[in-house]
Structure formats: structure tokens, C-alpha cells
Regions:
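Non-heme Fe(II)/2-oxoglutarate
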Residues: 61, 68-153
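Double-stranded beta-helix
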Residues: 8-69
């Protein structure tokens, strides 16, 4: 789930999405691209396919499947475009971001495991941020589980 905190326009870098790409299965991701630290799907893998821009008003939400190919356009506005994303997955399943905390939103089997304290959530993120910035977190911030050794990478 992608939430627009401010208006997201084509000029200020809204998301783009390739319709139906989630049906094609996992895509090669490379973490050594110059454009971002987070693993990205190389342009060569998409063979020139362009995404459809998804402008969203402030407070608007975009929902998509985890295998949907998406990216943000560059922010050419000179202003701020602010958003947040929430990733939902079954309890115990890796998020792909081992440096960052997760939490249980709902559990019929174990309601006591649900995190309902926003201060506890904020504290967990503060601790994670401090560990990454100080160098105490020595693992990979993002999992490189998608064929980083592929020729295209």
C-alpha cells in the first residue's frame, strides 16, 4: 500500500505501474545500480515497457500486488513529494528489509501479538535507524535474494 502524504503528480514524481506485470512472476533485481540503493528491476529486463503514471491526491492510496513492477518518476518540481508505503505479508515471512522492524497488525490465532502501541512502533524505528546510521547494523539493509549475479546486473 502506497500512501500519498502530499499530492503526487507526474512533475513531482508520482508512481508508475506496469499493468499485469504481477502475473509474469518475480523479476531480476539488481542492487548495484547507480540510481538507488534499494534493489531495482533493470530497464533491460522490462524491454522498454513503460509504466502508466498514477497521480494521487494528498491522502490518496495506491494498492498493488507485491510483484507488480512499479517505480517513482523523478521529482522535477523543485518541491517535496512525500509518501509512505506499508507492506503486508504473513507473520513469519521475511519482509526483504532485515534492517527495519516489522509488526503484527492482526492475528486471530494470537491477538496478544498485535502491536497497538504507536510509541513502541516509533521506538523500534528509532532504534533501527540509529543502528543503521551508527554502523551497529552490519547486515544488508535490503535482501539481495533476486539474482544479483544475473548477467544484466
Amino acid at each position: 500500500m502506497w500512501l500519498a502524504i502530499t499530492e503526487a503528480t507526474i512533475e513531482n514524481g508520482c508512481l508508475t505501474s506496469i499493468a499485469g506485470s504481477h502475473r509474469e512472476g518475480p523479476k531480476v533485481h539488481c542492487s548495484n545500480l547507480a540510481i538507488a540503493r534499494e534493489p531495482q528491476v533493470p530497464d533491460e529486463v522490462m524491454a522498454g515497457r513503460e509504466g502508466t503514471p498514477l497521480p494521487v491526491s494528498k491522502g490518496g492510496v495506491v494498492l498493488f500486488h507485491k510483484m507488480n513492477v512499479h517505480r517513482a518518476l523523478p521529482n522535477l518540481s523543485g518541491g517535496l513529494r512525500w509518501s509512505m508505503d506499508l507492506r503486508y505479508h504473513p507473520v513469519g515471512q521475511a519482509s526483504g528489509r532485515p534492517a527495519f522492524p516489522g509488526f503484527v497488525a492482526r492475528s486471530k490465532a494470537d491477538p496478544q501479538s498485535e502491536l497497538r502501541d504507536p510509541q513502541a512502533w516509533g521506538d523500534a524505528w528509532d532504534t533501527a535507524r540509529d543502528a543503521v546510521l551508527s554502523g551497529r547494523f552490519t547486515g544488508r539493509i535490503f535482501e539481495d535474494r533476486r539474482w544479483n549475479d544475473a548477467a544484466v546486473c
